[in-house]
Regions:
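Glycine-rich, Arg-bearing micro-motifs that act as flexible, cationic patches
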Residues: 101-126
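Small/aliphatic-rich secondary-structure junction motif
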Residues: 2-49, 53
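Short, solvent-exposed amphipathic alpha-helices that sit
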Residues: 21, 54-66, 89
Length: 139
């Protein structure tokens, strides 16, 4: 098993806390991190295509920010911008790099939706075959 840590990052408070924890653990074990921004494709056509372009642009900016945070912390990081459902994407990336852990915030930008239809962390802990660290967001 590698010393890589996969972290789900979306630029929200939950994402920032997850990234901080991934960086802390990576420093402790002498590992690196893979920062993943996963997004569900928006249906194409007309204004929806424009929205999809905005989502992609935002994702690139968010990953650039995260890569800079890792560099300041002195941790080697690579970024993955992947279309797909976040829990499934995080598992696929973790499997591909034989990650030691997956780190994710307890919620992103829609905590109520997660409570109703099932959150990404909930799905992730049931799909992953490796430890998942769910970082609680302080009140």
């Amino acid at each position: 098993m590698s010393k890589s840590i996969v972290v789900g990052y979306d630029g929200t408070d939950g994402g920032h806390h997850a990234l901080d924890e991934a960086l802390r653990v990576a420093a402790e074990i002498g590992g690196d991190i893979v920062i993943v921004y996963a997004y569900d494709k928006i249906l194409s056509g007309g204004e929806l295509a424009d929205l999809d372009a905005v989502v992609k642009e935002r994702g690139v900016a968010i990953l650039t920010e995260a890569e800079g945070i890792a560099a300041v912390a002195g941790i080697t990081a690579r970024v993955e911008f992947v279309e797909g459902r976040p829990a499934e994407v995080l598992v696929e990336v973790a499997d591909a790099c034989d990650a030691r852990f997956i780190v994710i915030g307890s919620y992103g930008d829609r905590p109520l939706k997660g409570a109703i239809v099932g959150s990404t962390p909930y799905k992730l802990i049931h799909l992953a075959d490796r430890p998942v660290i769910v970082v609680r967001i302080p009140d």
